Amino acid sequence: MSTTVIILAAGKGTRMRSQLPKVLQPLAGRPLLGHVIKTAKQLLAENIITIYGHGGDHVKKTFAQENIQWVEQAEQLGTGHAVQMTLPVLPKDGISLILYGDVPLVRQTTLEQLIEVSNKTGIGMITLHVDNPTGYGRIVRQDGKIQAIVEHKDATEAQRQIQEINTGIYCVSNAKLHEWLPKLSNENAQGEYYLTDIVAMAVADGLEIASIQPELAFEVEGVNDRLQLAALEREFQKQQAKELMQQGVTFADPARFDLRGTVKVGHDVRIDVNVIIEGNCELGDFVEIGAGCILKNTTIAAGTKVQAYSVFDGAVVGENTQIGPFARLRPGAKLANEVHIGNFVEVKNTTIGLGSKANHFTYLGDAEIGAESNIGAGTITCNYDGANKHKTTIGDAVFIGSNSSLVAPVTIGNGATVGAGSVITKDVAEQSLSFERAQQISKANYQRPQKLKK
């Protein structure tokens, strides 16, 4: 049976007090709506229909690369009205999941369970038991079976005591949506077309409404303001840290860790406080990440230790490598095994061979460095001439003295030595010594200037 996912994303988000549409507010490094689209794709939905309204052009532009059908809701006249807008493009057969762009964290497994129970009856929903149901639609049951959903403003005092609430997430046969949606009425306290009225229609048709409860309550929590956004962020990060610990990761403090993407971890990984992981990362066995590090789209192989406040973006790091503190690896940085990158060293678009070292205050850009070479403190590859980037090639077992400038394009041959303080503008042959500096001048018995007396 084919699956369509309908995502309601037309809300204005006034309480966010933001120029950014609510569904584009970031949570764990991804727009709220992006989380929902990701889950829809995980379900292998044949169709994803997203209903847009306020800030629609911005929303559509953000997800221009996604295979989505966009439907406009020019006037926000309720959730039922929003889904009515999809009828011209909604398939006649199959089922539809109805989700929300501001309810970002409902899990694939939960929705798969909802689909399974709904297939038996033609309609199903996710409900939740809460201590304080104020403001939510109540689930009215008779003999355990759902009879209706009553919105808070329309509920009697007795109905307001019910603690089972409607999350708004449904799975309904498309045939029934085509039958029920045109019949919706706005004769209620809000003057809106309630999607919840399809429940009463199902009961009138003699259908039993299936329901499930989510394993985690935050799966169905919506976001209306920045307080709720921050609270949901922390709940989600807490859950992600828990899952990583179950995979064998040790955190110095799981409450001070943010995962804003995905990470694949090996055995016995250790992560200190205030580490942020973004994009798609991979950490091998026995990797250690120091405090305050930021990793983005980076792979770090087994046994590597990263000291505090190092930043990685698009880097590939080999085994048993030592990095930091305060190192920066930019896109294109590729480090072989047993490399040492020390404090205040920046590496960009550069490969570094087995066992080579750059321990202090160095910039290595657009370079290729062989094995067992030593790059002295203060060395700079001068890769940019003001118009174009050029490559520096350093062979195996090369020794670059401190405070050297290597003006690309230039090649330093295997086994060569560059004297400290040199500005190298020409290739250096293998096994040779090259240095370039002004002649030292020394003056005996030199007297420093004295401060004038006032």
Swiss-Prot record:
- GO:BP terms for this protein? cell morphogenesis; cell wall organization; lipid A biosynthetic process; peptidoglycan biosynthetic process; regulation of cell shape; UDP-N-acetylglucosamine biosynthetic process
Q: Which residues bind UDP-N-acetyl-alpha-D-glucosamine?
A: 8-11, 22, 73, 78-79, 100-102, 137, 151, 166, 224, 330, 348, 363, 374
In the record, the note on similarity to other proteins reads: In the N-terminal section; belongs to the N-acetylglucosamine-1-phosphate uridyltransferase family.
Point out the gene that encodes the protein. glmU
Which residue stretches belong to region N-acetyltransferase? 248-454
Cofactors named for this entry: Mg(2+)
Question: Where's the active site on this chain?
Answer: 360
**Database matches in Pfam families:** Hexapep, NTP_transf_3
The highest taxon in the source lineage is Bacteria
**Cofactor: how bound:** Binds 1 Mg(2+) ion per subunit.
How does this chain assemble?
Answer: Homotrimer.
Location of the region described as Pyrophosphorylase in the Swiss-Prot/TrEMBL record: 1-226
* UniProt binding sites for acetyl-CoA: 377, 383-384, 402, 420, 437
Which InterPro entries has this protein been placed in? Bifunctional_GlmU, GlmU-like, GlmU_C_LbH, Hexapep, Hexapep_transf_CS, MobA-like_NTP_Trfase, Nucleotide-diphossugar_trans, Trimer_LpxA-like_sf
Chain sites annotated for binding Mg(2+): 102, 224
Q: Which UniProt keywords apply?
A: Acyltransferase, Cell shape, Cell wall biogenesis/degradation, Cytoplasm, Magnesium, Metal-binding, Multifunctional enzyme, Nucleotidyltransferase, Peptidoglycan synthesis, Repeat, Transferase
Name by which UniProt lists this protein: Bifunctional protein GlmU
Please list the reactions this protein catalyses. Answer: alpha-D-glucosamine 1-phosphate + acetyl-CoA = N-acetyl-alpha-D-glucosamine 1-phosphate + CoA + H(+); N-acetyl-alpha-D-glucosamine 1-phosphate + UTP + H(+) = UDP-N-acetyl-alpha-D-glucosamine + diphosphate
- Residue ranges annotated as coiled coil are none
Which HAMAP family does this UniProt record tie to the protein?
GlmU
What's one GO-annotated cellular component? Answer: membrane
Native organism: Acinetobacter baumannii (strain AYE)
Q: Tell me where it resides.
A: Cytoplasm
Q: What is its EC number?
A: 2.7.7.23, 2.3.1.157
Spans annotated as Linker: 227-247
